Amino acid sequence: MWNKNRLTQMLSIEYPIIQAGMAGSTTPKLVASVSNSGGLGTIGAGYFNTQQLEDEIDYVRQLTSNSFGVNVFVPSQQSYTSSQIENMNAWLKPYRRALHLEEPVVKITEEQQFKCHIDTIIKKQVPVCCFTFGIPNESIIKRLKEANIKLIGTATSVDEAIANEKAGMDAIVAQGSEAGGHRGSFLKPKNQLPMVGTISLVPQIVDVVSIPVIAAGGIMDGRGVLASIVLGAEGVQMGTAFLTSQDSNASELLRDAIINSKETDTVVTKAFSGKLARGINNRFIEEMSQYEGDIPDYPIQNELTSSIRKAAANIGDKELTHMWSGQSPRLATTHPANTIMSNIINQINQIMQYK
């Protein structure tokens, strides 16, 4: 059976389909619906404070008794100068003026927030913890393992996958360059972040690690799931496929933008957050490409553009807000998450039946 392997056994799920933990876009209903359908629903905790994460976990548990996960951002060393922030604020001033916004006060609480998230995940006995932007330190991994929590890392290159396995991850998401949203890269060969496609990345990682590999990037339906399995993956992680679902927290602006976009409409940019992320191209990205200074690293740039993005989204201006999307938007639907899951499973079974 295509759905019975080490990953499904490890995560206590029926189907090796993971809903990506998209920060700001998951809801308890989405997470629970995927888990109730036999996959692994994942809370995107990247922008939550401690109370928000606790409430989200409790709400998910009211809706499902099945396994689920929490995705957290691993803090990185911020590299920035006061002049970088001043120059960026000057550049962003016209946008803020047009939207009647004040200049924000940048608050960096990433490290403390991450530690609180780990404490909450252990306290609440969340079955699975997923990491983006790097690998946590040895003591955190030890604490999570002692609590019998399964750990999933993210890799955008073979070297990152090897580092994840060496650190003690139980499985690895191989994130291809087709993936929407933030790149999970954390190793920089020759100062260039990896941009390897899913079909190239997955088998190369599979060949060098012994733990289960989860394919991600551009996978939207049963065909993508089966193709990933043929490449050696034992599961898939899908983001955009669930982002446009009725059950996600995506705005109608974002949902409509993805549904009506083409495979050539997305670009990879640092403009909004300071980390590379794939989204639908717009005026803000185009104009930021003309910025001659250094864009401050995440989370600085994320803080500096936050109010602009929120205000633009609130008035339906898709030109000044981020619209994360993978490279397969033509395959997106607005179905409920359980319908998306059943359609994927039915499509796989039909393909298997006729091959």
Curated annotation (Swiss-Prot):
Pfam families: NMO. Binds 1 FMN per subunit. Its cofactor is FMN. GO terms for biological process: response to toxic substance. Gene3D superfamilies: Aldolase class I. InterPro entries: Aldolase_TIM, NMO. Its EC number is 1.13.12.-. Transmembrane segments: none annotated. P3N is a potent irreversible inhibitor of the key enzyme succinate dehydrogenase in the Krebs cycle and electron transport chain. P3N has been shown to be a toxic metabolite to bacteria, plants, fungi, mammals or any organism that uses succinate dehydrogenase. Nitronate monooxygenase that uses molecular oxygen to catalyze the oxidative denitrification of alkyl nitronates. Acts on propionate 3-nitronate (P3N), the presumed physiological substrate. Probably functions in the detoxification of P3N, a metabolic poison produced by plants and fungi as a defense mechanism. This is Probable nitronate monooxygenase. The lineage of its organism: Bacteria, Bacillati, Bacillota, Bacilli, Bacillales.
